């Protein structure tokens, strides 16, 4: 595994060859729900305009790109790790597991895997960790969009089940509103019990 910081156009050209997969995660910070990862192999003959780090895109733009990625990419796969797995393994190792699941779910075996961040799990193929890769490599940008939309939809579904928690607004992140809901309404089965605010609410 190589960790690449400040990637140059020449390095991009060297590693973005063959059926390479971009991988990214969403949901390491929230107090509730799955950590969600996605793996995407784009079609160089069917480009998608406007790809970028999902955090820099509006919800409407993410939804539009989500549909385009599903339609135009050669392969798209989502992998998750549950709150129970996060509590058992810790969030870092659970995220690595979710990434492995996403790559394993691709219907094309990638020639290499490019991951946003500073580390990758073992995928059984060449892999590169690219710092800020979600804004530099289109396949990683696409993966960040897929993972973000999937997780946001999971939070919206949870908001319908537990409307008093406001998950549709804060998406499970540790906001003041979430802390107040924990205090007033208690811990849900979907909360991550190993995260300190949840642990303190259980005490």
From Swiss-Prot:
Recorded GO MF terms: manganese ion binding; RNA binding; RNA-DNA hybrid ribonuclease activity
Residues where a divalent metal cation binds: 24-25, 116
Taxonomic path: Bacteria, Pseudomonadati, Pseudomonadota, Gammaproteobacteria, Alteromonadales
Keyword presence, Ribonucleoprotein: no
Pfam families: RNase_HII (PF01351)
Cofactor(s) this protein cannot do without: Mn(2+); Mg(2+)
Cofactor, free-text remark: Manganese or magnesium. Binds 1 divalent metal ion per monomer in the absence of substrate. May bind a second metal ion after substrate binding.
Localization (cell): Cytoplasm
InterPro entries from the UniProt entry: RNase_HII, RNase_HII/HIII, RNase_HII/HIII_dom, RNaseH-like_sf, RNaseH_sf
GO cellular component: cytoplasm; ribonuclease H2 complex
CDD domains (alphabetical): RNase_HII_bacteria_HII_like
Domain RNase H type-2: 18-203
Enzyme class: hydrolase
SUPFAM superfamilies per the UniProt record, alphabetical: Ribonuclease H-like
Species this protein is from: Shewanella halifaxensis (strain HAW-EB4)
Function: Endonuclease that specifically degrades the RNA of RNA-DNA hybrids.
Primary location group: cytoplasm
NCBIfam families linked: PRK00015.1-1 (NF000594), PRK00015.1-3 (NF000595), PRK00015.1-4 (NF000596)
Protein name: Ribonuclease HII
């Amino acid at each position: 595994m190589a960790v690449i910081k400040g990637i140059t156009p020449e390095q991009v050209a060297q590693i973005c060859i063959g059926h390479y997969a971009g991988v990214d995660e969403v949901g390491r910070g929230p107090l509730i729900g799955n950590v969600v990862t996605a793996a995407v192999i784009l079609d160089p003959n069917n480009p998608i305009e406007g790809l970028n780090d999902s955090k820099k895109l509006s919800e409407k733009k993410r939804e539009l790109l989500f549909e385009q990625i599903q339609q135009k990419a050669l392969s798209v796969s989502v992998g998750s790790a549950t709150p129970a797995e996060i509590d058992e393994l810790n969030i870092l190792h659970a995220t690595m597991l979710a990434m492995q699941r996403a790559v394993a779910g691709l219907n094309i075996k990638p020639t290499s895997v490019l991951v946003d961040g500073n580390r990758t799990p073992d995928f059984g193929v060449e892999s590169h960790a690219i710092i800020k890769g979600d804004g530099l490599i289109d396949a990683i940008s696409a993966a960040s969009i897929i993972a973000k939309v999937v997780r946001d939809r999971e939070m919206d579904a949870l908001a319908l089940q537990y409307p008093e928690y406001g998950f549709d607004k804060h998406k499970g992140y540790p906001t003041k509103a979430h802390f107040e809901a924990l205090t007033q309404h208690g811990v849900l089965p979907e909360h991550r019990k190993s995260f300190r605010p949840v642990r303190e609410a259980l005490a």
